[in-house]
């Protein structure tokens, strides 16, 4: 069993999720602790501003000085996060053997065969004096994979930990939503569509950043879904394409919805997330007995209640319902687990999860000298 820290900075750019787990990288896991370190407002703004500038791969070179500056700052914030988590642990922190460092995605495009995360794994290792695994997506993409999603093999571990019956599905509603379907030895995973990103973006635009997200789905409940705009979004070829498949937050344009009032825009994008998830179920045979919701979107009552109403034959639950699981830290826990698998040379991506040519051990490993 190896004790590892996982670090995740998601599409919301709000801060660093950090988790400590102990695992053998295969079947056993102990959840030790979690910690969230928020970004300062100015840094968050600069990070989001950079992401908005990068719409194509050529923009990486164009904005390289800005990227390098932010990468160093982001790495130092991750260092501070680990130090604070170590302090929280006290003497137990000496048992930490490995750090899984995802970094911050600034560009993801399967078409370009590129997925760029900023975060200096070598600097992180040097400053923390810890073994570090980073660059988790690179090897998968270079071998024909989508580079996403990466959490399915961790969902498989959770299924065993929670002793669920087959078939079961985990749906993570982050910036982008993705699904992992498990049935005996079968594992299938793909992005379903937008999660919170479009909802958050239109709220931030229309409120000039006074409101960051739809707390409990309150805005969506007050609005009316524009069915014509919704159907236009759902007509995108992505939704009829067979998995595996992945998305980036820039794959959907929000211009069509800018003319709507705030509540209607939020209701329309929230329903878009719901309908995209429902369409993803068409690729699952047989249907899962249970769907487990993870990620920030599980807290959105509008999305949760709409899914429960429209998907009547499947039990839908939030992962927090189950023993000692905190749904806010699934991805950070996953990257701790993926780091351990990488260290032990066990595959983290598969043809059925990313479309890679073969099961692959991913991630660059930096060992302390």
State the predicted function of each range.
Residues 1-5, 290:
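Extreme N-terminal starter segment of soluble prokaryotic enzymes
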Residues 22-80, 85:
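Glycine-rich nucleotide/cofactor/substrate-binding loop typically near the N-terminus or early
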Residues 16-23, 33-50, 127, 133-161, ...:
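Glycine-rich phosphate-binding loop plus the immediately following alpha-helix
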Residues 9, 13, 271, 321-368:
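Glycine-rich phosphate-binding/hydrolytic loop that grips phosphoryl groups
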Residues 58-121:
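Short beta-strand-loop/turn "lid" adjacent to the catalytic site in phosphate-handling enzymes
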Residues 96-153:
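Glycine-rich phosphate-binding loop and adjoining helix at the ATP-binding site
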Residues 93-102, 287-297:
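Short glycine-rich phosphate-binding loop at a beta-alpha junction
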Residues 209-290, 301-314:
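A contiguous, well-structured pocket-lining segment that forms one wall/lid of small-molecule binding clefts
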């Amino acid at each position: 069993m190896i004790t590892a820290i996982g670090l995740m900075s998601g599409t919301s750019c709000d801060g660093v999720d950090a988790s400590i787990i102990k695992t053998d990288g295969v079947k056993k896991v102990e959840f030790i602790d979690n910690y969230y370190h928020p970004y300062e407002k100015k840094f968050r703004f600069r990070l989001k501003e950079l992401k908005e500038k990068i719409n194509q791969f050529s923009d990486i070179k164009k904005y390289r000085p800005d990227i390098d500056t932010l990468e160093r700052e982001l790495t130092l914030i991750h260092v501070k996060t680990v130090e604070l988590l170590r302090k929280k642990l006290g003497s137990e922190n000496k048992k930490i053997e490995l750090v899984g460092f995802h970094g911050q995605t600034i560009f993801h495009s399967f078409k370009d065969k590129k997925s760029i995360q900023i975060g200096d794994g070598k600097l992180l290792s040097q400053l923390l004096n810890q073994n570090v695994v980073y660059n988790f997506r690179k090897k998968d993409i270079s071998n024909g994979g989508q580079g996403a999603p990466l959490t399915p093999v961790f969902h498989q571990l959770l299924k065993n930990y929670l002793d669920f019956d087959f078939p079961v599905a985990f749906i993570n509603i982050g910036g982008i939503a993705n699904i992992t379907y498990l049935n005996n030895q079968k594992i299938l995973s793909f992005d379903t569509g937008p999660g919170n990103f479009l909802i958050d973006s239109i709220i931030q635009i229309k409120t000039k950043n006074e409101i960051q997200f739809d707390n409990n789905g309150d805005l969506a409940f007050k609005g009316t879904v524009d069915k014509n705009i919704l159907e236009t979004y759902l007509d995108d070829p992505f939704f009829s394409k067979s998995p595996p498949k992945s998305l980036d937050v820039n794959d959907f344009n929000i211009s069509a919805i800018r003319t709507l009032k705030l509540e209607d825009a939020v209701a329309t994008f929230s329903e878009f997330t719901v309908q995209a998830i429902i369409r993803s179920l068409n690729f699952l045979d047989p249907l899962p007995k249970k769907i487990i919701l993870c990620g920030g979107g599980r807290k959105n009552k509008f999305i949760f209640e709409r899914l429960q109403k429209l998907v009547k034959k499947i039990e839908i639950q939030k992962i927090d319902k189950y023993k000692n699981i905190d749904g806010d830290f699934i991805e950070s826990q996953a990257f701790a687990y993926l780091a351990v698998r990488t260290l032990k040379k066990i595959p983290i991506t598969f043809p059925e999860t990313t479309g890679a040519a073969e099961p692959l051990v991913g991630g660059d490993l930096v060992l302390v000298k």
